[in-house]
Amino acid sequence: MSETSRDALRERALKLDATDPLAGRRELFALDDGVYLDGNSLGALPVHVPARVQDVLTRQWGELRIRSWDESGWWTAPERIGDRIAPLVGAAAGQIVVGDSTSVNVFKAVVAAARIAGEGRDEILVDATTFPTDGYIAASAARLTGHRLVPTDPADVPAALGPRTAVVLLNHVDYRSGRLHDLPGLTAAVHAAGAVAVWDLCHSAGALPVGLDEHGVDLAVGCTYKYLNGGPGSPAYLYVAERHQAAFDSPLPGWNSHADPFGMTPGYAPADGSVRGRVGTPDIVSMLTLEAALDVWDGVAVDTVRAKSLALTDFFLECVEAYVPAGRVASVTPAAHAERGSQVALRCDEAEPVMRRLIERGVVGDLRRPDVLRFGFTPLYVGFADAERAARVLAEVLAEIPPSGPAA
């Protein structure tokens, strides 16, 4: 490729950054001079969070101690923070509770969904290409409830549905390829079959509109350490549509979800509303870290984030095509906007050494064995110059590593 063409792409990147309505958000994050394209695995640290966490440790815990459960709002944090997440996934207040891990929330959601579905339905459909933990948990839930697990490709779900289908567990965005699945259409198909839809939003929340209420989703789960920037191991969340809350029967009925948690009665009586999704004492330090991190979303429209995400991934793919010799990489991320999340996955036979050298040169992505390079584009802090630089460095690295086989 000529230097003139490279200069043209660099100039375009600078112009795009200059007109980016989200460009100012980058300064809200602790970033170095490198290119961070792994926000689909762990989001960057918002710069104001350490001071907020210090207050939690020194004043709320250190000085107020037990009083902070009331005076600092610790007890109500799971629902309060859930209401902060709600508009980011298209949900009204009162339907999301924060706490536990994604795996635990998947278990709660799938078992509760099977119970909502009722008698006569004994199959749980699960995305056959799912992130492994969802498959493990769904299999355990099936054993516990006496259901049969049916792994199914998302494209085949409508044909696989039937009168025995109780629950369908799907990923909104595929963690490996970045494919965006048809949440509205698949949810409608699940409902038409009389089943309950459970969605995993780990790779979509904070990257694109979800529309939980608009599309009638029954239950959903998601993590908060990717595009929501809640920090390593930050608590996950559980969405229970208001219409299902009275029937939500958690398989983990802990004291925190009791109607009178301090009554200490031997019998369990569930609380009303989203509180039913709680289990035990919340992880307050991680939870309040997440609450502070969510401040970066103030004044940001998810539609604006989505528009930039698509523009970034389009531009990155254009730069890869321009810089990288044919045959070295092949995109496994759909080109169609309606089918693309906020990452680009490139198949590359030399994925491990390539990613290692990219990171050494300041371009941080990750890989999924054996041969997929993943580049996550977090619109709040990734710019177009980052996309151009990442593609350029990728080409330089590939020029140094002999090909070992076809990429496609």
Question: Language model features by range: what are they?
Answer:
Residues M1-A408:
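Pyridoxal 5′-phosphate
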